A protein has these predicted regions:
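Membrane-embedded alpha-helical bundles that constitute the cytochrome b-like, heme-associated redox core
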Residues: 1-208
């Protein structure tokens, strides 16, 4: 729900920038074929794209208000879920399975990635069912890096935070770069979910 509403917010202005100028054709990426004429008046409203409600929440076009409300409504559940998850990790000592204890995990993760990328299946009986270096590094990044950054960059987009603490968005350079970072984190989450579900399906739901 939080990702789908985020997609609806994104397509209302499907361009991402690294500065607050947001001038014509200075975006670093766009999700629309439409180009902006530099010699005529233009508003972001004209740039809004339609998206299927199957993908976006609520989907359609010019629904950014509902999308933002849906996005904000899911945030408390995202935070509570994260707090409970981390508490259980600490309480059960399972955090030791997620937190790397050596930089050796980086070359080890690369080796595992090459193993996956060449479609080589792990040797049984352990196979996929015990954490390898890439899994450990991925889960650590999702829980302890991506989740906090998603919340921090999201706060940098808040007008209330900006008016009260106008120094805060500058931690991410500016408002638009915070939006870009927020999108990149969402994209990383989507990739993680797709790969995670694909590997679970590949190895068998009952075994994993």
């Amino acid at each position: 729900m939080i990702i789908r509403s985020g997609v609806s917010i994104l397509v209302d202005h499907p361009r991402l920038y690294w500065n607050d100028g947001c001038g014509p054709e200075i975006e670093w990426i766009r999700f629309t074929p439409k180009k902006i004429a530099k010699d005529k008046m233009w508003t972001a409203k004209e740039d809004s794209r339609y998206i299927s409600p199957v993908v976006g929440l609520p989907g359609y076009r010019h629904t950014v208000g509902i999308a933002r409300s849906s996005h904000f409504l899911t945030i408390p559940f995202f935070i509570i879920n994260g707090i409970v998850f981390i508490f259980l990790l600490l309480y059960t000592n399972l955090w030791k399975r997620l937190v790397p204890d050596s930089f050796q995990i980086i070359p080890d993760s690369w080796n595992v990635f090459l193993h996956y990328a060449t479609f080589n299946m792990p040797i049984e009986p352990n196979g996929f069912y015990h954490f390898n270096a890439l899994q450990q590094l991925s889960y650590f990044a999702v829980v302890f890096i991506m989740a906090p950054l998603a919340m921090l960059t999201g706060l940098a987009r808040s007008p209330a935070i900006d008016s009260r603490f106008n120094w805060y968005p500058k931690l991410f350079f500016n408002h638009q770069s915070a939006r870009s970072f927020h999108f990149l984190i969402m994209f990383a989450y989507v990739i993680f979910i797709i790969v995670h579900v694909a590997l679970v399906a590949l190895t068998g739901f009952t075994k994993t």
